[in-house]
Design a protein with these regions (language model features):
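Enriched for short, Lys/Arg-rich terminal
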Residues: 2-5, 13, 24, 65-95
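N-terminal first-folded block
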Residues: 7-41
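Aromatic-residue detector
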Residues: 19, 32-34, 38, 63-65, ...
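Basic/aromatic recognition patch in beta-strand/loop cores that engages polyanionic ligands
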Residues: 40-81
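Hydrophobic coiled-coil of the DHp/HisKA dimerization-phosphotransfer domain
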Residues: 5-7, 55
Length: 95
């Protein structure tokens, strides 16, 4: 059974801050890596973001969580501020 991707309600804001090249690159990485094997490509996070994973794409980070066969993407930001932004978002909204 393949994975299904769901997005946090604020992900659109993250993507709107990126240029078209970066958005395309991130979209391709999600399709090529996360849909195929999110456990292999994502690194587990620790501390306040324990239970989440991160996918590195150049200077950007995709923070996600795996729940059964769903990949819930919480945010996409530059590596310098991703952790602070994600921690401030709190619980995942699966919609």
């Amino acid at each position: 059974m393949p994975y299904i991707i769901k997005y946090h309600k604020t992900l659109k804001e993250d993507l709107n801050e990126l240029d078209e090249f970066s958005r395309s690159r991130i979209r391709k990485a999600i399709e090529a890596r996360l849909l195929i094997d999110p456990l292999k490509y994502g690194q587990l996070l620790k501390g306040t973001l324990k239970g989440f994973r991160i996918l590195r794409i150049g200077g950007y980070r995709v923070v996600y969580k795996i729940v059964k066969k769903e990949i819930i993407i919480l945010g996409v930001r530059h590596r310098k501020d991703i952790y602070e932004i994600i921690a401030s978002r709190g619980e995942i909204n699966k919609r």
